[in-house]
């Protein structure tokens, strides 16, 4: 794995987390217990910080990045990802807040200042534009993402299932090392 410091700040990775050897984690990134970071993920906490909550999985090819302090973005935009979150393959999450128990679908993009509330599901390929507030308990799809309906019971259950499944999978990978 490529774990790199940026300036004087090194990533902090909890015991029991899994970072695949083909992933890149740079700078001010904190990865909590039971997190899994899969191949080709880039988590670049260079110009602001990234925090990833317990039991979250970041799937293959996803990009996690932040925005710096500037006149366009005073204070910049860090990236906060809660616990039990699934970030699907090739998603881009940039300078936003994703609360607990969310799913960000494959190839979805969540931009600066957006907030994805607990229990929300952002559909594959959707775009959450800067500053959008994504209400929890609903499916959001499209470009820009729009609330289309309440999550069904099976979808709500899947939020928990996905987090647990990826904890089990990363434990298999860890035991094979």
Label each region the model flagged:
Residues 49:
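A short beta-loop-beta micro-motif enriched in histidine and acidic residues
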Residues 15, 20-21, 26-27, 32-33, ...:
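Left-handed beta-helix
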């Amino acid at each position: 794995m490529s774990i790199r410091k940026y300036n004087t700040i090194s990533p902090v990775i909890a015991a029991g987390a899994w970072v695949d050897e083909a992933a890149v984690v740079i700078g001010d990134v904190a990865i909590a217990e039971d997190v899994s970071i899969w191949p080709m993920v880039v988590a670049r906490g260079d110009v602001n910080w990234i925090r990833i909550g317990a039991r979250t999985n970041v799937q293959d090819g996803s990009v996690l990045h932040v925005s710096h302090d500037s006149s366009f973005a005073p204070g910049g935009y860090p990236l906060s990802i809660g616990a039990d979150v699934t970030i699907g393959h090739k998603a881009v999450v940039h300078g936003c807040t994703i609360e607990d128990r969310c799913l960000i679908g494959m190839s979805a993009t969540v931009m600066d200042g957006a907030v994805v509330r607990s229990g929300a599901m952002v559909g594959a390929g959707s775009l959450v534009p800067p500053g959008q507030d994504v209400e929890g308990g609903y499916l959001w799809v499209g470009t820009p993402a729009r609330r289309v309906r309440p999550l069904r019971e099976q979808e709500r259950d899947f939020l928990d299932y996905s987090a647990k499944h990826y904890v089990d999978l990363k434990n298999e990978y860890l035991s094979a090392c």
